[in-house]
Each structure stands twice: as structure tokens, then as C-alpha cells.
């Protein structure tokens, strides 16, 4: 005897809501439109994103691409329900990486993955991404929202970003001009940025304090969820008037690991840790986590989010220019002879 199967499955019953995805696209279109810049040839929703290179402004244009994420800072955002800032973080991590080679960010794409799509949460994140793109001067031209039931628990989500920029071939900053005697200038960070959060979360958990606990006049959560500073516009403006020998984005690994990445063979860096005041959040983390000072500088930015290397004769005007552009800049050290490494004094 033949029996009829009473079940009738569809994609939504399997955990993927196409209608919710479409609703999200409509929600984020106004935010994406605010980021449009010359070169954008199509809006969101196509199979691919189109961008016309500004070849009239370059003799030999070179594309520079970067990709990154926000790491476990997302866990704090999810637990606190504060999602917009991590969108800014995502753009910052990618755009700051490519500007260190002298590149002007052109466009950005994002990847948002979750187990069950919450349109409000995703829209908040992507609104933050659009805000970050405005700060970096790049266009949000597309992205992917992946709803993957069974892959992520509850309201968890993950982010990845992709940024493409352009630089004149002769103007690429690769560290090759760095010489002993060059000066190092630090740009203040806004906090831990988007690195070291696995250790941060461990310390916070050990402390037994909630994100609303006061730390130096601010809630702990406000310190930890402060968006990563985007240095793109002031640095691009600086490059118009100063020959920058190297730039180092101080991310995971701190100054200890990141500064040597831009130093040529035969050079090292001497950093004066008394040249700036370490923000209170880092002192709090060191105190509550019992973190040794070398480990602090190898894990966190410790208040310095970007380092600029210039010739000695350009130090004063670089500091003046960065200050006039709204950055807190301070002389932090110099280049010395030696193998690529950081020596703290």
C-alpha cells in the first residue's frame, strides 16, 4: 500500500529565512548609499560590485587589498547588545592595514555569518560598517549575509571585512627608506581597538566585575567596546606634505611584533615607554590580570594605534601636521642600527 508523506519542508523550516535576508538588504541600502564615492558603478544587490579605477589620477596604479575580522571583541558586543561599534572596528582593521602602504581605500565588502538572522542586529552592525567606511573614505559596495543554522549558537555571529585601495607605484610605503636616526611618532589609540580580547575577556572574567563596573570614570564596557580609531584620512593628508618612511598599524602582537614588520634588515627600533601615558584601561588590565609589562607590549597597543617613521628633520612638522588634523601624536622613539626588533627604554 502506498502512503503519502504528510511532511512538506521548505528553506525557512530548515532555518534559512530568505525574506529576512531581503528585508536586511532593504534596511541597509540607505546607509550604503551614504558611502558612495566616485568610481562606484552599481548599488547593492548585484552578483558582483563594479568600481571604476581613477586611472586619470595615477600613472602606475597599484591595488592594495586587505582582509581582517574583529576577533572575540564580538563576544562582548553580543553579550552587551551593543553591535554598531564592531562594524566600525571591522572597517578600521582593514583600512588601517592598507593605508600603511600609502594606499587610499576605495571600496569595502563585508561577510556576516550567523546561525539565525536577526535583522535588527545585522542592520546595526552594517550601519556601523557604513559609518566606518565614511570615516575611511571608501564605499561599501557589497557583502554577504550567511544564515547557517547549526553552525552558530543562539544570537552569535561572526564578521570578516575586505578592503581594496590604490597607490601610485612609486609612492608605495614599504619601509625601504627607513634609516638609523629616523624618528618614530605614535598616534593615540582609542583603547584596545580590536586585539587582545581573548586575554581581556579572561581578565574580566577573573575579576568578577560586570561591564557596568566603573574604571577611571567610565564603565568598563565603554572602555572595551570603544571603536577602533580609523587613521586613514589624516595619514593620507600627511603624505601630501611629508615623506613618510614607514607606517606600522599596531594590532595583535602590539608594538613588539608589528613595528619590526616594516623595518629593513640592519635596523631596529628604540621605544621610550615614558613618552606617553598608558590609558587607564591598560593599567586596569595589567593590574587585574597580573600581566607582565613585556607581555602587555606584545599583546596590546598600550595606547599607540599607529606608528609613523620619518626623517629627523621632518619630526617637528609631522607632529604639528598630525595635531592640526585632530590626532594626538607624540614622539615615541627612533630607529637604531641592529636587526629588526623593538628595544624598550
UniProtKB/Swiss-Prot annotation:
The set of disulfide-linked cysteines is: none
Listed EC numbers: 6.3.3.1
Q: Which Pfam families match?
A: AIRS, AIRS_C
Which GO BP annotation is one of this protein's?
'de novo' IMP biosynthetic process
Q: Which InterPro entries match?
A: PurM-like_C_dom, PurM-like_C_sf, PurM-like_N, PurM-like_N_sf, PurM_cligase
Where in or outside the cell is it found? Cytoplasm
The pathway entry for this protein reads as:
Purine metabolism; IMP biosynthesis via de novo pathway; 5-amino-1-(5-phospho-D-ribosyl)imidazole from N(2)-formyl-N(1)-(5-phospho-D-ribosyl)glycinamide: step 2/2
Listed A to Z, the keywords are: ATP-binding, Cytoplasm, Ligase, Nucleotide-binding, Purine biosynthesis
The reaction(s) catalysed by this protein are: 2-formamido-N(1)-(5-O-phospho-beta-D-ribosyl)acetamidine + ATP = 5-amino-1-(5-phospho-beta-D-ribosyl)imidazole + ADP + phosphate + H(+)
Q: Which GO terms describe its cellular component?
A: cytosol
Which molecular function term from Gene Ontology is one that the record holds?
ATP binding
Q: What class of enzyme is it?
A: ligase
Q: Which family does this protein fall into?
A: Belongs to the AIR synthase family.
Question: What is this protein identified as?
Answer: Phosphoribosylformylglycinamidine cyclo-ligase
Taxonomic classification, please?
A: Bacteria, Pseudomonadati, Pseudomonadota, Gammaproteobacteria, Methylococcales
Gene name, per UniProt, is: purM
Amino acid at each position: 500500500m502506498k502512503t503519502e508523506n504528510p511532511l512538506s519542508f521548505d528553506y525557512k523550516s530548515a532555518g534559512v529565512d530568505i525574506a529576512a535576508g531581503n528585508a536586511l538588504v532593504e534596511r541597509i541600502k540607505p546607509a550604503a548609499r551614504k558611502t558612495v564615492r566616485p568610481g562606484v558603478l552599481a548599488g547593492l544587490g548585484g552578483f558582483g560590485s563594479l568600481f571604476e579605477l581613477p586611472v586619470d589620477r595615477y600613472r602606475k596604479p597599484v591595488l592594495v587589498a586587505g582582509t581582517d575580522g574583529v576577533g572575540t571583541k564580538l563576544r562582548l558586543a553580543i553579550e552587551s547588545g551593543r553591535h554598531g561599534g564592531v562594524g566600525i572596528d571591522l572597517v578600521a582593521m582593514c583600512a588601517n592595514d592598507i593605508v600603511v602602504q600609502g594606499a587610499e581605500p576605495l571600496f569595502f565588502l563585508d561577510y556576516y555569518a550567523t546561525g539565525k538572522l536577526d535583522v535588527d542586529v545585522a542592520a546595526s552592525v552594517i550601519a556601523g560598517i557604513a559609518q566606518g567606511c565614511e570615516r575611511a573614505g571608501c564605499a561599501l559596495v557589497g557583502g554577504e549575509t550567511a544564515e547557517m543554522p547549526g553552525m552558530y549558537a543562539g544570537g552569535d555571529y561572526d564578521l570578516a571585512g575586505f578592503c581594496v585601495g590604490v597607490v601610485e607605484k612609486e609612492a608605495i610605503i614599504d619601509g625601504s627608506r627607513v634609516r638609523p636616526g629616523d624618528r618614530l611618532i605614535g598616534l593615540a589609540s582609542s583603547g584596545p581597538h580590536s586585539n587582545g580580547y581573548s586575554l581581556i575577556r579572561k581578565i574580566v572574567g577573573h575579576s568578577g566585575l560586570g561591564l557596568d563596573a566603573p574604571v577611571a570614570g567610565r564603565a568598563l564596557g565603554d572602555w572595551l567596546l570603544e571603536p577602533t580609531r580609523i587613521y586613514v584620512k589624516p595619514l593620507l593628508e600627511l603624505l601630501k606634505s611629508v615623506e613618510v618612511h614607514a607606517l606600522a598599524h599596531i594590532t595583535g602582537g602590539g608594538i613588539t611584533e608589528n613595528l619590526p614588520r616594516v623595518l629593513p634588515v640592519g635596523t631596529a627600533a628604540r621605544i621610550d615607554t615614558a613618552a606617553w601615558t598608558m590609558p587607564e584601561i591598560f593599567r586596569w588590565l595589567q593590574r587585574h590580570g597580573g600581566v607582565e609589562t613585556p607581555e602587555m607590549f606584545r599583546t596590546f597597543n598600550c595606547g599607540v594605534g599607529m606608528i609613523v617613521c620619518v626623517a629627523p628633520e621632518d619630526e617637528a612638522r609631522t607632529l604639528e601636521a598630525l595635531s592640526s588634523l585632530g590626532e594626538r601624536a607624540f614622539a615615541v622613539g627612533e630607529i637604531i642600527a641592529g636587526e629588526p626588533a623593538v628595544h624598550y627604554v
